C-alpha cells in the first residue's frame, strides 16, 4: 500500500497542491496513507509541505478532531434539521445509518448522546437491526476487530436495501455514492435524510423525496 500510495502521488504531483487540489482520506485510507502522500510530495518539491493533504497524523501537522469531524458535522446537521421540522430529539426518534465507518460511527455516537435511538447500522456485508437500539459500544469494538456486522450477535441481520426502507425517522447514508436511486427511493420512509457520503442520493431520488416532503 505504501509503494502504491507513493507512486500515485508521484504521478499526480503536478496537479495537486495546497493552493490547487488537496487530497483527503476516504474508503480504504487513513492518517498513515496521507502521511506517505505528504512525505512523497514534499520530497518531490524539495521542502516540507504539510498543506498538500488533510487527514494527516497530528505529529506531522494534522488537526485534532479531523478523524471525527465529518461524522460530528452530520450529527450537527441532523439536529438542525430536526429543529426545523419540529422533531424532538429523544429516545422515540429512530435512526438508521448506512455505513458504520469513519463517518457513520462518530455520527451514531453523537446522536445517541443526544438521546435518540440508533436502531440499524450497516457495512459492506449488510446491516443489523434492533428495535430497542443497537449497542453502539459493542458495535464499535466489533468492527474495530475487523469483523463484519452481519456476524455480530444479539441483533437481527438485514440487507442494506432493507435498512434503507426501514420505518424510521432519520436515515444517514454514510458509505458510498448512488445508494438511494430512482429504483428504491419510493421505499424510503425516513423524514430526514442526512448525507454523510459523497452523493449517496441521485438527482432523481432527491427530486422524488423532496416532493414527498423528506427534509
Predicted regions and their residues:
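Glycine-rich phosphate/diphosphate-binding loop of Rossmann-like nucleotide-binding domains
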Residues: 65-165
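Flexible, charged surface loops at secondary-structure boundaries
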Residues: 163-167, 186-188
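Glycine/serine-rich phosphate-binding loop and adjoining beta1-alpha1 elements at the start
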Residues: 1-91
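Structural motif
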Residues: 96, 170-172, 194
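Flexible loop/turn segments at secondary-structure boundaries
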Residues: 30-31, 103-105, 126-130, 178-181, ...
